């Protein structure tokens, strides 16, 4: 019988990151997937990144993850969203060549050190019990292979008892043409995990040769594409355009007349879909005052004849999809290559997890990705890398759990939201979810996380050396700019617009002014041109935000004081005087490990926090006496 340190079930975005992270740390790792040909599949839109999401990809990359490097190899239309706004809300995004992305990911995974890949369907897993504690023991495949493992990570995506819907038609599937995971769903029920149902959707795929692009608005990427990975030097594939069209009143009339035929109005009406990525039927129903909704026509590859119409996910029958599409400019003669559909699937209540993504019920069992109620490739990758890291670290008692706080990363914000608040609808990250977004930017993920990753052996020495050199360059350039003092008169000689108030300023302070950038500063400081472009941009961003950092850092300090006030995992909240039954039940269910985490649980009052703090002082004194 085979024995592994870590077994990962599922080869999607969460599974690939989980397996690779565990293997990097040195764990003997097995990735089990239905088919190696679907590893790294982009099930829905052929794009990576976006607002908040792009920052997560950079954070995964900063921990030596795969997604950033792979999308840089597959990018065919790259841009920074929100570029006109502040850097704290910039969103790197790249349209991918779907085939190149998948092939690149497969090539990495199938040749990764310490990682074995097995084609099989997992139907069950077993646990052992000792002293009323349950621990993962084996994984059982459909052909009755028994595989022993110390740690198990489930990254089942939409496959957990998945069902696809197109109008009144439905069939068991986790993705179009692929069988769902039924056995594992029954296993989780058997072990009393709290399961719910969610759904998501995808639009029809269109034949590029049947679309009239003349008259549509061209959407080019950035003239100088920015890589996602801190290890990538450039984007090498040719960059091609997307096109923008829109629905109209005729489109909406077709949809309204056929709402009763959409699965979302019938069999799926009580199952929550992504709030911020609604189907076209839901858009028409919820925003009845609008006469138009944007549709982005996105190529699926350099040599692909498939167009992904971003903005019109649907669960309507095929004939309605045709009727609807033919009312949209450019799509009057469109041919559908594959129907749009909705898929419903099981997810677990993420409040049953620790911040490590290990389950509270069963030791050694981890969940990552859509099984935790999230939506999006990037959210899945962020959870996958954390689950893989913690599964591998837990094999060695010298390591503490690797937990990213809300002040560390968007990944930390997401996981804290999930395990503390739970979710009743597909969870998506936004910059507005992060309290400390001035510090959690897409440009500085490596400065925030790479050293932490190196300390636990998930980051290579090569990447860490690059980080150290970059840090030193940032310090050097910052000091140079802080030590050059100028006057308004001197600046005027260089045609640099600044108030003639007689105030002497350092060049670093000057960068904090609106409309002053490194290109302007280089007129009076040629040394700037000697530094790497990314380093110069990093220093400029820090200068822009410098006046605001003191307040944000004070907020972070107060936050960390509560985060570092730990609550023992074995505490009995029923023994704390002054807590209502309702509050005791919430605390027992979620089992917060810090005062900060307890405070974020809905319904936990300031008085309850005070009572817990009093009890903790008593608990600590009793333990030391």
Swiss-Prot record:
Its cofactor is FAD. It is found in: Cytoplasm. The keyword tRNA processing applies. GO terms for biological process: tRNA methylation; tRNA wobble uridine modification. Pfam families: GIDA, GIDA_C_1st, SAM_GIDA_C. FAD binds at residues 10-15, 122, 181, 370. NAD(+) binds at residues 273-287. InterPro entries: FAD/NAD-bd_sf, GIDA_C_N, MnmG, MnmG-rel, MnmG-rel_CS, MnmG_C, MnmG_C_subdom, MnmG_C_subdom_sf. One of its GO terms (cellular component) is cytosol. It comes from the Bacteria. GO terms for molecular function: flavin adenine dinucleotide binding. The keyword Flavoprotein applies. Belongs to the MnmG family. Homodimer. Heterotetramer of two MnmE and two MnmG subunits. NAD-binding protein involved in the addition of a carboxymethylaminomethyl (cmnm) group at the wobble position (U34) of certain tRNAs, forming tRNA-cmnm(5)s(2)U34. This is tRNA uridine 5-carboxymethylaminomethyl modification enzyme MnmG. The lineage of its organism: Bacteria, Pseudomonadati, Pseudomonadota, Alphaproteobacteria, Rickettsiales. The gene is mnmG.
């Amino acid at each position: 019988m085979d024995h592994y340190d870590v077994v990962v079930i599922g080869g999607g975005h969460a599974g690939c990151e989980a397996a690779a992270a565990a293997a990097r740390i040195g764990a003997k790792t097995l990735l089990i997937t239905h088919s190696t040909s679907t590893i790294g599949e982009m099930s829905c839109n052929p794009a990576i990144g976006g607002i908040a999401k792009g920052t997560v990809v950079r954070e995964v990359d900063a921990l030596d993850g795969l997604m950033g490097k792979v999308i840089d190899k597959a990018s065919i239309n790259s841009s920074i969203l929100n570029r006109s706004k502040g850097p704290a809300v910039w969103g790197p995004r790249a349209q991918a060549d779907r085939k190149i992305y998948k092939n690149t990911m497969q090539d990495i995974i199938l040749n990764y050190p310490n990682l074995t890949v097995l084609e099989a369907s997992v139907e069950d897993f077993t646990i052992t019990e000792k002293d009323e504690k349950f621990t993962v023991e084996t994984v059982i495949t459909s052909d009755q292979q028994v595989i022993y493992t110390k740690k198990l990570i489930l990254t089942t995506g939409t496959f957990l008892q998945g069902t696809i819907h197109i109008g009144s038609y439905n069939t068991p599937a986790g993705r179009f043409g692929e069988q769902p995971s039924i056995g594992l769903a029954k296993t989780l029920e058997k072990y009393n995990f709290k399961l719910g149902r969610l759904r998501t959707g995808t639009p029809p795929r269109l034949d590029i040769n049947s679309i009239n692009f003349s008259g549509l608005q061209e959407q080019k990427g950035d003239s100088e594409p920015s890589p996602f990975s801190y290890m990538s030097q450039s984007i090498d594939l040719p960059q091609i355009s997307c096109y923008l069209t829109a629905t109209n009143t005729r489109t909406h009339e077709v949809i309204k007349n056929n709402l009763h035929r959409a699965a979302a109005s019938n069999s799926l009406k009580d199952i929550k879909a992504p709030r911020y990525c609604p189907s076209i039927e839901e858009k028409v129903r919820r925003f009845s005052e609008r006469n138009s909704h944007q549709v982005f026509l996105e190529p699926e590859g350099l040599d692909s004849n498939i167009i992904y119409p971003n903005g019109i996910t649907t669960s309507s029958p095929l004939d309605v999809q045709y009727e609807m599409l033919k009312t949209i400019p450019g799509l009057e003669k469109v041919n559908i290559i594959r129907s749009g559909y909705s898929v419903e699937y099981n997810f677990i209540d993420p409040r049953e997890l620790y911040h490590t993504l290990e389950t509270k019920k069963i030791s050694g069992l981890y969940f990552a990705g859509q099984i935790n109620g999230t939506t999006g490739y990037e959210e899945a990758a962020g959870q996958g890398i954390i689950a893989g890291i913690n599964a591998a670290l837990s094999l060695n008692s010298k390591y503490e759990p690797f937990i990213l706080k809300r002040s560390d990363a968007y990944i930390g914000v997401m996981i804290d939201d999930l395990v503390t608040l739970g979710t009743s609808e597909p969870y998506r990250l936004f910059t507005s979810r992060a309290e400390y977004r001035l510090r959690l930017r897409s440009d500085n993920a490596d400065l925030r996380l790479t050293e932490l990753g190196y300390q636990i052996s998930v980051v290579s020495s090569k990447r860490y050396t690059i980080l150290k050199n970059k840090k030193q360059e940032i310090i050097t350039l910052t000091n140079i700019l802080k030590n050059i003092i100028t006057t308004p008169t001197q600046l005027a000689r260089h045609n640099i617009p600044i108030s003639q108030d007689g105030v002497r300023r350092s060049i670093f302070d000057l960068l904090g002014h609106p409309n002053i950038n490194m290109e302007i500063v280089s007129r009076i400081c040629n040394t700037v041109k000697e530094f790497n472009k990314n380093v110069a941009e990093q220093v400029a961003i820090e200068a822009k935000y410098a006046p605001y950092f003191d307040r944000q850092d004070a907020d972070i300090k107060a936050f960390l004081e509560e985060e570092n006030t730990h609550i023992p995992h074995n505490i009995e909240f029923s023994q704390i005087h002054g807590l209502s039954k309702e509050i005791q039940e919430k605390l027992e269910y979620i089992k917060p490990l810090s005062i900060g985490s307890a405070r974020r649980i809905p319904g936990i009052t300031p008085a309850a926090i005070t009572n817990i703090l009093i009890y903790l002082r008593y608990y600590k004194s009793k333990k030391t006496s």
